[in-house]
C-alpha cells in the first residue's frame, strides 16, 4: 500500500537471515528510510514482526541504530526454525508451525534461499478440530516441499473424531500441493524411513505443536538412524 505510513521495502532472503528496508513518515510528515534491517530469522511473518517492533520503537523515540542492532542480535525463540543438528550435509530443523499460514510462510522463506535443495516437511497434525476446519488450507500449504511426511495426529486433549481420516487428508495434500506425501506410524517408522531414503544436502523441517520436537531431536541419537 503506497499510501501507508509505514512500508516494508526490498526484502532480501539470505540463508540464515532476512534483510529489508522500512520507509515511513515522521511526525513532521517527512519521508524517512531505515535501510538494511537485518534479522536472523526466515519467513515473511518474521519480517512483519520485526517491522512492527521497529514501528513501536520509532514511535517511542528509540534511536534507529539501537533498533537495528537489537533486531540483528535477536535470534528468536525456540522452535521457530531452530536448527537441531546436521548429518551428512542434511540439516534438521524444528518449528512450532501448526497452522496453514505459518507453514506456508516458513516453506516460502526456506525455498527462496534454497532453490535447489530438497525440502522435507515432517508434519504432525494438531487437534482434530483445527485440521478438520482448515482441511482445504492445509492441503494447499505444502507446495514448496518436495516431500511431506505425515505423522499421527496429536489430539491435545480432544476426543478422537472418527470422521477424520489421515489417509484422505494426506491424499488431499498430495493433490492440492502437488507434492509427494507419505504417512509414518510412529517415531521409529520415521527414523527408518529417513535412514533408508535420505541422500545428502537435504532440509528436514519438523512442524507441529505436539511431540514432533522430540522426534526430530531424537533422530540424532536414535538406534535406527
Residue spans for each PLM region:
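Nucleotide phosphate-binding/pyrophosphate-handling subdomain across enzymes
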Residues: 28-147
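A glycine-rich beta-strand to alpha-helix segment
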Residues: 189-220
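Generic structural signal for residues in well-ordered beta-strands
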Residues: 20, 37, 92-95, 181, ...
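Beta-strand->loop->alpha-helix junctions that form or flank phosphate-binding loops
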Residues: 1-14, 38-44, 68-72, 184-185
Amino acid at each position: 500500500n503506497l499510501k501507508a505510513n509505514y512500508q516494508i521495502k526490498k526484502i532480501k532472503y539470505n540463508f540464515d537471515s532476512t534483510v529489508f528496508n522500512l520507509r515511513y513518515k515522521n511526525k513532521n510528515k517527512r519521508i524517512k528510510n531505515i535501510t538494511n534491517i537485518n534479522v536472523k530469522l526466515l519467513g515473511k511473518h518474521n519480517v512483519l514482526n520485526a517491522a512492527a517492533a521497529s514501528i513501536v520503537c520509532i514511535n517511542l523515540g528509540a534511536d534507529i541504530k539501537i533498533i537495528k542492532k537489537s533486531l540483528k542480535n535477536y535470534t528468536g525463540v525456540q522452535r521457530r526454525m531452530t536448527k537441531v543438528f546436521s548429518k551428512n550435509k542434511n540439516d534438521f530443523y524444528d518449528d512450532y508451525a501448526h497452522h496453514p499460514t505459518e507453514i506456508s510462510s516458513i516453506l516460502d522463506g526456506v525455498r527462496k534461499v534454497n532453490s535447489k535443495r530438497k525440502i522435507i516437511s515432517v508434519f504432525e497434525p494438531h487437534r482434530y478440530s483445527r485440521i478438520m476446519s482448515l482441511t482445504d488450507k492445509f492441503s494447499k500449504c505444502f507446495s514448496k516441499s518436495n516431500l511431506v511426511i505425515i505423522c499421527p495426529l496429536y489430539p491435545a486433549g480432544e476426543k478422537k473424531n472418527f470422521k477424520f481420516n489421515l489417509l484422505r487428508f494426506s491424499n488431499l495434500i498430495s493433490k492440492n500441493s502437488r507434492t509427494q506425501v507419505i504417512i509414518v506410524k510412529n517415531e521409529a517408522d520415521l527414523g527408518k524411513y529417513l535412514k533408508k531414503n535420505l541422500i545428502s544436502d537435504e532440509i528436514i523441517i519438523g512442524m507441529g505443536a505436539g511431540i514432533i520436537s522430540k522426534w526430530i531431536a531424537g533422530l540424532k541419537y536414535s538406534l535406527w538412524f
